[in-house]
From Swiss-Prot:
One of its GO terms (cellular component) is lysosome. Ribonuclease which shows a preference for the pyrimidines uridine and cytosine. Has potent antibacterial activity against a range of Gram-positive and Gram-negative bacteria, including P.aeruginosa, A.baumanii, M.luteus, S.aureus, E.faecalis, E.faecium, S.saprophyticus and E.coli. Causes loss of bacterial membrane integrity, and also promotes agglutination of Gram-negative bacteria. Probably contributes to urinary tract sterility. Bactericidal activity is independent of RNase activity. This is Ribonuclease K6. Its EC number is 3.1.27.-. Belongs to the pancreatic ribonuclease family. InterPro entries: RNaseA, RNaseA-like_dom_sf, RNaseA_AS, RNaseA_domain. Residues 1-27 form the signal peptide. Induction: Up-regulated in bone marrow derived macrophages in response to the uropathogenic E.coli strain CFT073. It is an enzyme of class 3 (hydrolase). Pfam families: RnaseA.
Length: 153
């Protein structure tokens, strides 16, 4: 059997791109969305990106390309969920913008393969937008909890 490679090339490329996108969007088994948000985005005191990202990458077993750490407590970020709703990038209306700018660090993958991922860091002081949902049984007992960092503004 001869495979018509040019005919199937777009499908092969799509499949090749799907795996990193799936990994980017998936949360580890056994974690609620709020707990995964906390692991990925909450860091009360600054750490070097190479150190901080190990805590994220150990769950997914790959080097996450870009990640932002908010230097705030989970409680303070969850308080943002009580502010007025705005539209998220995906069109849903469960996002909320922080009342004040916060310190944060953007970590960008510069090289290395898991588990030896290397990152550069960019310190910022900006507003953030989070998507919030009702908590699961294992989540902290807030009315709403952050589950996705939607945007930095």
């Amino acid at each position: 059997m001869v495979v018509d490679l040019p005919r199937y090339l777009p499908l092969l490329l799509l499949l090749e791109l799907w795996e990193p996108m799936y990994l980017l969007c998936s949360q580890p088994k056994g974690l609620s969305r709020a707990h995964w948000f906390e692991i990925q985005h909450i860091q009360t005191s600054r750490q070097p990106c190479n150190t901080a990202m190990r805590g994220v990458n150990n769950y997914t077993q790959h080097c996450k390309q870009i990640n932002t750490f908010l230097h705030e407590s989970f409680q303070n970020v969850a308080a943002t969920c009580s502010l007025h709703n705005i539209t998220c990038k995906n069109g849903r209306k469960n996002c909320h913008e922080s009342a004040e700018p916060v310190k944060m660090t953007d970590c960008s993958h510069t090289g290395g393969a898991y588990p030896n991922c290397r990152y550069s860091s960019d310190k910022q002081y900006k507003f953030f937008i989070v998507a919030c949902e009702h908590p699961k049984k294992e989540d902290p007992p807030y009315q709403l909890v952050p589950v996705h960092l939607d945007k930095i503004v």
